[in-house]
């Protein structure tokens, strides 16, 4: 919502690519605590200051975001899958299926989220277990690969991701989900 990955992806795809920054109105209203502005204001600032002319904002919830099926090469879900999963795993599966429909055959869905552990209150801590995400991806029909690149061993998974002692340095998983050809 705040534009961190939007900035990176805009630079990665260059002038010939397009980045769709999809958010909900509710998500854009959250306060970006490090910058004392809303997520929407932070996103707009990154777009303006970064000269990100290839970014198109979509402020609508899934599934009806106005993009054609089989039209996207890559989608990223950054630290929000737990928000869908923890209240209702079926809702998370539906989201993955909706995103899969938007991807071209062979397209990639990247997912990163805060790692939770069994037996802890992952909902209140805004986390989820890696295996839960992998099982959802397999149920949705994706090929699944994982990476350890976002792991943070100092996070023992016992605190909310918003705990200031973590300074946002949470232990995260990274999954590469591929839509079959």
Where are these regions (language model features)?
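A short glycine-rich, Lys/Arg-flanked "PGG" loop and its adjoining helix->strand segment in the class I
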Residues: 10-11, 91-105
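S-adenosyl-L-methionine
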Residues: 31-65
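Core SAM-dependent methyltransferase catalytic element
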Residues: 140, 156-181
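A short acidic, Gly/Pro-enriched loop at the edge of an enzyme's catalytic core
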Residues: 52, 65-76
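Conserved SAM-binding loop of SAM-dependent methyltransferases across substrates and taxa
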Residues: 2-14
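Conserved Class I S-adenosyl-L-methionine
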Residues: 44-47, 121-147
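A short SAM/SAH-binding and catalytic strip from SAM-dependent methyltransferases
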Residues: 62, 73-90
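Conserved beta-strand signature within the Rossmann-like core of class I S-adenosyl-L-methionine
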Residues: 106-115
């Amino acid at each position: 919502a705040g534009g961190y990955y939007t900035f990176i992806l805009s630079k990665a795809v260059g002038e010939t690519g397009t980045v769709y920054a999809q958010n909900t109105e509710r998500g854009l209203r959250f306060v970006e605590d490090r910058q004392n502005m809303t997520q929407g204001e932070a996103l707009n600032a990154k777009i303006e200051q970064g000269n990100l002319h290839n970014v198109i904002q979509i402020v609508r919830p899934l599934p009806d975001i106005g993009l054609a099926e089989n039209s996207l090469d890559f989608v990223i879900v950054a630290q929000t899958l737990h928000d869908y999963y923890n209240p209702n795993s079926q809702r998370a599966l539906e989201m993955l299926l909706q995103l899969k429909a938007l991807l071209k055959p062979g397209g990639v869905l990247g997912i990163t989220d805060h790692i939770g552990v069994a037996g802890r209150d992952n909902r209140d801590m805004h986390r989820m277990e890696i295996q839960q995400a992998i099982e959802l991806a397999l149920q949705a029909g994706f090929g699944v690969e994982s990476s350890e690149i976002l792991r943070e061993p100092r996070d023992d998974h016992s605190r909310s991701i918003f705990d200031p002692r973590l300074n946002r340095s949470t232990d995260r998983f990274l999954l590469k989900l591929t839509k079959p050809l």
